[in-house]
């Protein structure tokens, strides 16, 4: 243990609502609150908004309809963003049944710019490259959060805070009751690959993996992905699986990032050797791994299986 010196922390900003985490969820919460008249600030540790969709390269928005495909259950700012992307040919719509949307395939680089626009148009104060460090609690009330960025260490004061960090970082630092799974869902490192379709068009990907995964030390699982709108032959592939890693733990997250990238290389080596991947090339990797599960915060209301399966509506939906 070391003892840090006492210090005074400057206030970077004050608002009605502070949103920690600039995923699409965080952005939509911030924009909606601002449109309703609140003064809002949003804090994101990456260089862009959009979370797993942008920094994680996951370019599919799915489950737009109820399980019987009769009712659209996701709309609002999600669909507004889709319409913005349509204007620049940054999205492809895939209908599953009927005429309501099934899922959307996005160019997530274009999505970054559209989310910037939503934030700016709503006059939300934004901090990118800014890391949440600690809560500031006085007299039992959360008054501010401590953050750090290139300007140094500072505080953001607000009347209300939204934890959109994905891992419940604010709730965890506040010591709120939480639970964890005995077996985490695996994390996935995606990849943008050029000439992917050409590499596998004469092969069955699943059979190749079953036959040769041990040679490249690849885990069991399944792969999926899609072509990137606006490109000629770039494909987003999501088929790696990092098991038994808690991405809310610093050391385990580091392992997961490195192992996920190793698996991407293994997949490409497999296809170069046993398929037609000689001309295939790696275009980009995500700035962080796609995490499916870490902490579960015990909230006032907990979603049930029925809520999800039947698309239950809530009066306070964003």
Q: Which functions belong to the PLM regions below?
A:
Residues 1-17:
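Extreme N-terminal leader/targeting segments of oxidoreductases
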Residues 6, 32, 38-39, 44-134, ...:
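Conserved N-terminal/central alpha/beta ligand/cofactor-binding core
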Residues 13-15, 151-160:
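Core beta-strand elements of the Rossmann-like FAD/NAD(P) dinucleotide-binding domain
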Residues 20, 156-166:
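Short hydrophobic core segments
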Residues 90-106, 121, 173, 180-318:
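Mobile, glycine/GP-rich and aromatic-enriched active-site lid/loop segments adjacent to catalytic centers
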């Amino acid at each position: 243990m070391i003892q840090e010196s006492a210090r005074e922390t400057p206030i970077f900003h004050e608002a009605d609502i502070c949103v920690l985490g600039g995923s699409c969820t965080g952005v939509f919460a911030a924009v909606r609150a601002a449109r309703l008249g609140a003064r809002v600030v949003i804090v994101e540790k990456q260089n862009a908004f959009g979370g797993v969709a942008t920094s994680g390269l996951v370019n599919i928005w799915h489950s737009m309809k109820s399980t019987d495909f009769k009712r659209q259950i996701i709309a609002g700012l999600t669909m507004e963003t889709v319409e913005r992307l349509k204007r620049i040919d940054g999205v492809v719509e895939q209908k599953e049944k009927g005429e309501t949307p099934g899922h959307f395939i996005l160019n997530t680089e274009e999505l970054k710019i559209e989310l910037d626009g939503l934030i700016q148009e709503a006059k939300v104060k934004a901090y990118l490259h800014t890391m949440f460090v600690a809560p500031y609690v006085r007299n039992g009330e959360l008054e501010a959060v401590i953050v750090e960025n290139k300007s140094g260490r500072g505080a953001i004061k607000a009347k209300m805070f939204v934890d959109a960090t994905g891992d419940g970082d604010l709730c965890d630092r506040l010591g709120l009751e939480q639970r964890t799974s005995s077996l985490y869902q695996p994390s996935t490192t995606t990849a943008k690959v050029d000439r992917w379709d050409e590499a596998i068009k004469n092969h069955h990907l699943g059979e190749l993996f079953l036959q040769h995964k041990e040679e490249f030390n690849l885990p069991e699982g399944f792969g999926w992905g899609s072509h990137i709108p606006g490109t000629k032959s770039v494909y987003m592939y999501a088929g790696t699986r990092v098991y038994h890693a808690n991405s809310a733990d610093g050391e385990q997250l580091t392992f997961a990032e490195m192992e996920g990238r190793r698996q991407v290389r293994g997949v490409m080596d497999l296809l170069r050797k046993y398929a037609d991947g000689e001309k295939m090339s790696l275009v980009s990797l995500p700035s962080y791994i796609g995490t499916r599960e870490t902490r579960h915060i015990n909230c006032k209301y907990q979603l049930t299986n029925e809520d999800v399966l039947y698309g239950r509506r809530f009066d306070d939906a964003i």
